Curated annotation (Swiss-Prot):
Pfam families: LTD. The keyword Coiled coil applies. PROSITE patterns: LTD. This is Lamin tail domain-containing protein 2. InterPro entries: Lamin_tail_dom (IPR001322), Lamin_tail_dom_sf (IPR036415), Lamin_tail_domain (IPR052877). It comes from the Eukaryota. It comes from Homo sapiens.
Amino acid sequence: MRWLRPAGRRREQESVSGHLGPPAGAPAAPETPTCLPDTTPHPAPVVCSADPQLALESLDPRTLRLLWRQRELEIQALRWAIQNGEDARLCHILEEVAGLPPKRSSHSQEKLLQNQVQKLIQELKEQKERAQWEKEHLEERLLQTTRTLQEMEAELQNLQKSCLLQLARSSWVGRMLRSQTGSVEVVTAETLMDPSDLSENIQAPTGEGFRLEDVDWNSVARRYPNLFTNMEPSSKQKQPRPWPQLDTGSPESSGKHSERHHKTVEWGSLPCLNTSSSGGADSDSSSCRPGLPSFVQVIGHPPRDHRASSEQALVQAGSYSRDSEDLQKTHSPRHGEPVLSPQPCTDPDHWSPELLQSPTGLKIVAVSCREKFVRIFNPSQESTADLSGMVLKQLVRGFPERLYRFPPGTLLAPRHHVTVWGEATRSAKKPLRASSSREPVPLLSIRGCATLLLSPKGEVLSEHRIPRRETPAPRVFADGTDLSIDRFPLPEAGPGADTRKPPRPPRPLRKGRVREPRVSRRRPGTRGLLPPVSSGKLFHAREGPARPENPEIPAPQHLPAIPGDPTLPSPPAEAGLGLEDCRLQKEHRVRVCRKSVDRSCPLVALSVQNTAESRFGFRFLSCLPVTADTCRGA
């Protein structure tokens, strides 16, 4: 039938835009289809048939329902064409044919954007958490790296100290303190140096080796109790002064060991200090002449009281007059090894009348041939004396025999003194003769022998003369192994001895103590033990056993008592000492700082033998290094 043809076309339109029609279950419209006006762009199909025989009522319900849907679709198409135009309609048809998704509305686009924002926020949160975790991980790694770096720095510092100590052991970088007992203590120069005391206009020496800047002088004082002493205050001060904090500075120094005990003096600049200075050997080979080999040390501590210092000087000059009267030839080109150590002064009121006044105030206060030292004192209360270029000269019958020139930069603090040490010049077994041309002239206190202190211009600043006196050859460590510094007198010689022990009894008790308790320690073929009383008196009985009945042997003296202890009895006067010497021996009191020793510190290597045997076959107990001129028993 003709009227069914447009219906097939409309069914195609319904399939194309079926979503615009009513639902499938909608009831059919009751009105009959009529001819629609031609309002659409295309010619509308004519539903009515010219054949009157055909009526709509005669159609079945299904056909009517299809016709109704076709009309609805036409109405919707007309409305859409009116709203959007022909082009929009064609675009929509093309999109539907191509299967493209329909255009989203503003609501759907906003929802999509919100979903995207939420996704981005979630991703940012995850990235933030990941970054926080990475930050914590990096901080932990940084902390571990910092700890590892600190451990490596500590290990490096320990290695530096160990290397410095090993260098001090194997060379003359550090100073070696050796006593007659075989004890050896190595103290490096850097350990006793405090850079805070260096003056601004004085440059610190550029020595080789490691610099240790973290030096605590209180710990140094506890570490080296034998290097620091404090004399008893004067009678004007009733209460003792507290132990001062040792705040000193010193240059680095190093000496080089050469054959036949030759030491080349190598100096650095010394700081100008009002309190004290300390140091060791320094590397400056140009500061010493090659003709004056030596091993020089500069050690110092705060000034002591006038009275205590004068007592010490009087004890040295009175009780040990036999030694102090001997002329010391300060330096020997082959064996001389002077050691320079500034120390607190001696009282100028008790100086010998033979001492001369000098424009600079420097004075030679003591010369000992037996102990081989010359002591120079700076009596000034404020000014620091400059010893640079000054010369110590010893004349015998008007001819120079010994010569020592102070290195550049040598400063002497006010109320301090320096001690120039020399080694033995001849063997104890085979004394040298004065006529020998190949060996140094033996140290003899002969008439006309004088010790002069000359300025760099040659002016005589101080002169010290001693009457003629023959002295025996040095008997203790004449082979050059006794290298001690003038630093401390010890009340006791043993390493673990009690410093507050009362003085030893007279000769009868000492003889019993020497002969009875030490018999078990003898070895076959060794001689009897002697007490370590003096480096100069120790081997007086070298040719045979002890002879207590021999009146030529001087009576031993007791070590000074501890100051501030009224319970300790004063030593009794002995037969060989005068009243003046006994009085000086009682007044000479020393305070020694002895505290706990930090053995973990690698700055000091202290090796103490149980027993030590000298080249003469004698054995003596082990003790810490002592200075023979200030801590002698005889």
